[in-house]
């Protein structure tokens, strides 16, 4: 296969990976955790994956502790957890 063909194949595989949604079997376990604001009192708008609604929702993160189901952007949440 020519180098141009390999580059095309690599590009198509990369595009497929980006556009393929996360399936529940590939979803990290922490995506099932509830939103956890933590004990601190700073107010950071954040996002968490809600497995019941099957989407990322906004919540206020207190700035410390909490859990791994906590994302700065909705896009990051969706690419990690959303199906």
Curated annotation (Swiss-Prot):
Tissue expression notes: Expressed by the venom gland.
Organism expressing this protein natively: Pseudonaja textilis textilis (Eastern brown snake)
Region forming the signal peptide: 1-24
Miscellaneous comment: Negative results: has no effect on tissue plasminogen inhibitor (tPA/PLAT), urokinase, activated protein C (APC), elastase, factor Xa, alpha-factor XIIa, thrombin, and factor VIIa.
Gene Ontology terms: biological process: venom-mediated blood coagulation
Keyword Secreted listed: yes
Main location class: secreted
SUPFAM superfamilies attached to this UniProt entry: BPTI-like
Known uses: Could be used in a hydrogel with the procoagulant venom protein ecarin (AC Q90495) to greatly reduce bleeding. Was under preclinical trial by the Australian biopharmaceutical company QRxPharma Ltd, its subsidiary Venomics Pty Ltd (VPL) and the University of Queensland (UQ) under the name textilinin-1 (Q8008). Tested as a potent and selective plasmin inhibitor that has application as an antifibrinolytic agent to reduce blood loss associated with complex surgeries. It is being investigated as an alternative treatment to aprotinin (Trasylol).
Keyword flag Secreted: yes
Taxonomic lineage from the root: Eukaryota, Metazoa, Chordata, Craniata, Vertebrata
PANTHER family (UniProt xref): KUNITZ-TYPE PROTEASE INHIBITOR-RELATED, SERINE PEPTIDASE INHIBITOR, KUNITZ TYPE, 3
Residue ranges of every copy of the BPTI/Kunitz inhibitor domain listed in the record: 31-81
Disulfide bonds, paired cysteine numbers: 31-81, 40-64, 56-77
Marked site positions, Reactive bond for trypsin: 41-42
Gene Ontology terms, MF aspect: serine-type endopeptidase inhibitor activity; toxin activity
Alphabetized UniProt keyword annotations: Disulfide bond, Hemostasis impairing toxin, Pharmaceutical, Protease inhibitor, Secreted, Serine protease inhibitor, Signal, Toxin
Official protein name in the record: Kunitz-type serine protease inhibitor textilinin-1
One GO CC term, this protein: extracellular space
Biological role stated in the UniProt entry: Strongly inhibits plasmin (Ki=0.44 nM) and trypsin (Ki=0.42 nM). Has little effect on plasma (Ki=1870 nM) and tissue (Ki=12900 nM) kallikreins. Its plasmin-inhibiting activity makes it an antifibrinolytic agent. In vivo, reduces blood loss in a mouse tail vein bleeding model.
Similarity remark: Belongs to the venom Kunitz-type family.
Localization terms from the record: Secreted
């Amino acid at each position: 296969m020519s180098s141009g063909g390999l580059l095309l194949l690599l590009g198509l595989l990369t595009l497929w990976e980006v556009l393929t949604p996360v399936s529940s079997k590939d979803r990290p376990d922490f995506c099932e955790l509830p939103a956890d604001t933590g004990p601190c009192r700073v107010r950071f708008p954040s996002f968490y994956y809600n497995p019941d609604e099957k989407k990322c929702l906004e919540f206020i993160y207190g700035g410390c502790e909490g859990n791994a189901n906590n994302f700065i952007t909705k896009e990051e949440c969706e690419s990690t957890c959303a199906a």
